[in-house]
Structure formats: structure tokens, C-alpha cells
Amino acid sequence: MRHYEIIHTEDTRGFHVVFSVTPEECHLRDCFDLTETELIDLCEKIDRGIYAWFNARVEVYQQGILLGSDFLGGCLYDAPMTFVKESEYYDDMVKNAIQEATYNLEKLYESRNEVTA
């Protein structure tokens, strides 16, 4: 089981959003078309903490219940917060997770109405 570190939380559109990361297990050579020299240089910079190489996760909650999520692997940034503040991926992930949460809420309400009808 992977351990995720919470990096950022926010409340938006009636949902509590949690952004967390875990180290990427995939090797850089499997994700980028780099020369051997570029690959070695980049790996050294990751090892020294100059860059962060991670999987990103966005989870969306309402009243403490997980209703939606989105994941993205192969993220290479100066820091995970750079991903939040400067990439378009973070906003897309939040949007996708909220769409899933909204869908799940609608299904729950529908099934609840069927039970009580």
C-alpha cells in the first residue's frame, strides 16, 4: 500500500478537496525520451531534492465521505505545490474529481428515493 503525503487542502463548490502525493515508482526512462546523460542528470537532481518525482492524487469529500478522486502519475516539478499553483493538471484533476463526486451523489439520492418510495 502506498503512503500519500497531504500537500494542500481547499474547499470549493461545497466539497473539501485534498491534494496528496506519493513517490513515483516508474523510472524516468519509461516516461521521458532522454539521452543517457540527461537521464543521469535528472535522476541526480531528483535524488538531491531539486526536483520532485511523484504521483498526484486529488480526493473530494463531503461531510468526511470520499465521493470522488483523480490520479496522475509521472509528475516532475520543482515541488508538489508548484503542481498545484502552476500546472493546469491540478485544476483538471479537481474538476474531474468533483464531476465524479456529483455523479456519485446523484446515484445515492436516486437509490435512496427508490428505497423510500
Regions found by a protein language model. Give the residues of each.
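Acidic interaction surfaces
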Residues: 1-117
